[in-house]
Amino acid sequence: SYTNADYYVYSDPKFILKIGKKNLNLIDLYQKFNASQASFLTAYNPMSQEMTFEQNESMNNKLETLLVKMNSPFILAEGVCPESQFPGEKSFLVFGTELLIAKELGNKFQQNAVLWINKDAIPQLILLK
């Protein structure tokens, strides 16, 4: 489930985000990227339907290209759910993303949910479906 998942952020140092738990590493990154909000996004396994590695990589590359076009700074990340049959989902921690934009990107890539984090550095699960 989304709430039990570990959301790895591959910064230096790397750290794990948990829904509902404040993360001080995130505050440091907010300062670095001059941001006060962020989102955790993936294009893997749309509508929770398991896709092949190649399909997932292709969709995630499209998301990455879009983030670059939007000039949205991001760090590579990965969502891992301990009780899921899915392998980890490559993701992006994207800085400066307003909630509406995070939802739009999640919907564009047919995700059931996204994580959104405001200035309090507490990740929130935002259900889209």
At which residue positions do the language-model features occur?
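Short, flexible, glycine/charge-rich loop motifs used to bind or transfer phosphoryl groups or to couple energy/partner
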Residues: 29, 82, 104
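Short, compact, well-ordered microdomains
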Residues: 86-91, 95-124
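N-terminal, charge-rich interaction modules
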Residues: 1-65
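Mature, function-bearing regions of proteins
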Residues: 65-68, 123-129
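Short amphipathic beta-strand/extended segments with alternating polar/hydrophobic composition
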Residues: 18-20, 104-105, 126-129
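Amphipathic protein-protein interaction modules
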Residues: 57-101
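A generic "folded-domain core" signal
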Residues: 56-57, 117-122, 129
